[in-house]
Each structure stands twice: as structure tokens, then as C-alpha cells.
């Protein structure tokens, strides 16, 4: 369980803060989401991406969101 909490932590990549998360689907399974934010105050920007694969567990969804968010932040 401790590793799962580590996977949920915000990650700093350059000027971006990557926040992976999961959300339960009403029909079962989980969605993977990631928030990528930058800036401060009035100049802050937050992008939220929801990915199409359905996951069997919240942990798997968070792992996927984390990997995708890190890849996006490193590419930008």
C-alpha cells in the first residue's frame, strides 16, 4: 500500500507538476487521469487528460496516468 501512495504523489518535471489519479467508472473499472500544471497565480495553467483504456484497478490506472503524464511533461 505504501508504494501506491508514492504513485499518487505530485511529481515535478521541469516547470510542470504532474498529478496522476484514477476515477471509478459507473459500469465498473477505473479511468486514468492526469493533471499537468505550471505557473503560479493568474499565470497558472492546468491541463487534465483522461485516457481511454479501462483498468481493472485504481492502482493500474494511476500507474498508466503517471507514465503518460511524465512522458508528456518531458516532451514539452
Give the positions of each predicted feature.
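Short acidic, glycine/tyrosine-flanked loop/strand segments centered on an H-E-D-like triad
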Residues: 40-45
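A short, exposed loop/beta-hairpin motif centered on an aromatic-Gly-Thr core
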Residues: 46-60, 68
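Short arginine-rich
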Residues: 67-76
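A short local loop/turn or secondary-structure capping micro-motif enriched for an aromatic residue
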Residues: 27-29, 54-55, 73
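N-terminal segment of the canonical double-stranded RNA-binding domain
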Residues: 1-39
